[in-house]
């Protein structure tokens, strides 16, 4: 057996050349396009990103355009992708790039790594794919491939395992095609060396070099450290109407969903009488309350269990911003947690 060694390089490149996925950021691997795609793909499936990527590039085709964009524009383009700190860091980095690098990404791994929101994987991907630098790009897919190749039972979330994997793949980088090798490893993990006990070993171009396969462990690898249980928060979410206008609230600038617009909500699951009393105490002039279908939304560390209530007011409520349905649709980015409740406004 071979495990992670130079023997995997040529079979992977040949397999990649024979038929990798046609993705919009691969057809034109300019630095900006690679960078944006890698940020979008963090915590998000490829199929979900395709449409977002095309819309983003049409609206903000280069770094100066992103740097000059208003927050409402780039957050609206990001609406539904979640993890909004990613898009804010993209904008911060674009401003910095215009100030220090003439609106271009530097062809240097360490300088890429110093940009807001750019970690080792993203820096390695941009450096190798866009600039041809021989550095690894190790994401979750690649960590899984490495664990199976080596029959390694170290949890892939272990910092030492990640560091060793980066070092080992760095030693394999071909000087002429580092980006393609990185992409072939990502492609293998995304399409063949699948997670959750479902590897398609018979379709793998490096099956003959895989220690995990030959020892019968591919389906049980990789190991992950036990996840901490998510905290559950009960909330009462309000779809507020005053005439033809919809009431929104902006979240604090720090914390979960920082700075985003949202449907107002109250802690806990409130009964109709409790809710009416709470809103009256807040100075709201309530005409009608109507219960909506409950919903749940899962964040990384917390779950929201939400009871929805349609609230019709006689007068605008204090501390809310009222917008038209068209403005809500076109100009305000609402987190996907509220999607099922916003759909009530379209009925």
Which residue ranges define each predicted feature?
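Intrinsically disordered, low-complexity, charged terminal extensions of DNA damage-control enzymes
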Residues: 1-22, 27, 190-347
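Catalytic cores of DNA base-excision repair glycosylases
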Residues: 3-4, 9-202, 206-219, 285
């Amino acid at each position: 057996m071979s495990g992670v060694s130079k023997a995997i390089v040529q079979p992977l490149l040949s397999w990649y050349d024979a038929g990798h996925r046609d993705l919009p950021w691969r057809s034109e691997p300019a630095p900006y396009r690679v960078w944006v795609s890698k940020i979008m793909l963090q915590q998000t499936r490829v199929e979900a990103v395709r449409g977002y990527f095309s819309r983003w590039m049409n609206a903000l085709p280069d770094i100066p355009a992103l740097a000059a964009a208003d927050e409402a524009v780039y957050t609206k383009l990001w609406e539904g992708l979640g993890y909004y700190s990613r898009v804010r860091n993209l904008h911060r980095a674009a401003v910095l790039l215009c100030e220090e690098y003439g609106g271009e990404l530097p062809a240097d791994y360490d300088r890429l790594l110093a940009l807001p929101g750019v970690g080792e994987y993203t820096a390695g991907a941009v450096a190798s794919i866009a600039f041809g630098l021989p550095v690894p790009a190790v994401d979750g897919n690649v960590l899984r491939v490495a664990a199976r190749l080596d029959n390694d039972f170290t949890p892939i979330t272990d910092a030492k395992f990640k560091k060793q994997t980066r070092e080992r793949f760095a030693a394999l980088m071909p000087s002429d095609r580092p980006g393609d090798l990185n992409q072939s490893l990502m492609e293998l993990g995304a399409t063949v060396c699948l997670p959750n006990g479902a590897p398609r070993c018979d379709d793998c171009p490096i099956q003959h070099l895989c220690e995990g396969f030959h020892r019968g462990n591919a389906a049980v690898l990789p190991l992950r450290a036990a996840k901490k249980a998510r905290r559950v928060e009960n909330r009462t979410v309000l779809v507020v109407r005053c005439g033809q206008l919809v009431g929104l609230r902006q979240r604090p600038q720090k914390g979960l969903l920082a700075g985003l617009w949202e449907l107002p909500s109250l802690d806990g699951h409130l009964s109709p009488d409790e809710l009416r009393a709470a809103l009256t105490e807040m100075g709201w002039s309530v005409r009608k309350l109507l219960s909506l279908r409950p919903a749940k939304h899962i964040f990384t560390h917390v779950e929201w269990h939400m009871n929805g209530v349609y609230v019709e007011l006689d007068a605008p409520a204090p501390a809310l911003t009222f917008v038209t349905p068209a403005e809500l649709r076109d100009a305000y980015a609402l987190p996907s947690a509220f999607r099922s409740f916003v759909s009530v406004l379209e009925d």
